[in-house]
Amino acid sequence: MTQDEMKKAAGWAALQYVEENSIVGVGTGSTVNHFIDALATMKFDIEGAVSSSEASTEKMKALGIPVFDLNSVNELSVYVDGADEINSQMDMIKGGGAALTREKIVAAVADKFICIVDNTKQVDILGEFPLPIEVIPMARSYVARQIVKLGGDPVYREGCVTDNGNIIIDVYNMKIMKPKELEQQIDGIVGVVTNGLFAKRGADILLVGTPEGVKTVTF
């Protein structure tokens, strides 16, 4: 089974957690694109979706899935999204696709976070994948200096503008032993919109695409 086939298997497996007549929170990325394809098969059974990015919104609209503004929705039963890394505590690094802020907002609203990945995303310690931080453009140099003090190597992601009009700094060479603490520390830096650590609000259910099929992990 190829990596993309494992992503597809995980994406389709998430369909079992979608309730009829509900509004579904939908994330961003290659694995989520498979989930969106799956969700389209039951678009007449759900009310619609809330999207975490312009890219996912476009794909869902093209498939005929109604997309709602989060401000018009009081609750979401599930949020389905991928991860760049996830550990055994269900802490994640997300934001490789630069949609981390909106992803974090939608995840905060949802009752249940379903994380869908292929088995290459499971790690013991977070940090091999660079940690993305969304930053107000004028604060770029200041935030980078503060990240160096925390032990990271900040790199400006050239040519990347988020859906919110901000920039991304990717932090390399950090072994993240205490994800919740670091998430809070980075979010406390003036000029940071948010960072790609999802530890305060981690995943509730993990669906892992493997060569043997989809494995379900709960914490």
UniProtKB/Swiss-Prot annotation:
Belongs to the ribose 5-phosphate isomerase family. It catalyses: aldehydo-D-ribose 5-phosphate = D-ribulose 5-phosphate. Homodimer. This is Ribose-5-phosphate isomerase A. Pathway: Carbohydrate degradation; pentose phosphate pathway; D-ribose 5-phosphate from D-ribulose 5-phosphate (non-oxidative stage): step 1/1. Substrate binds at T28, G29, S30, T31, D81, G82, A83, D84, K94, G95, G96, G97, K121. GO terms for molecular function: ribose-5-phosphate isomerase activity. It comes from the Bacteria. CDD domains: RPI_A (cd01398). The active site is at E103. It comes from Shewanella pealeana (strain ATCC 700345 / ANG-SQ1). HAMAP family: Rib_5P_isom_A. One of its GO terms (cellular component) is cytosol. One of its GO terms (biological process) is pentose-phosphate shunt, non-oxidative branch. Its EC number is 5.3.1.6.
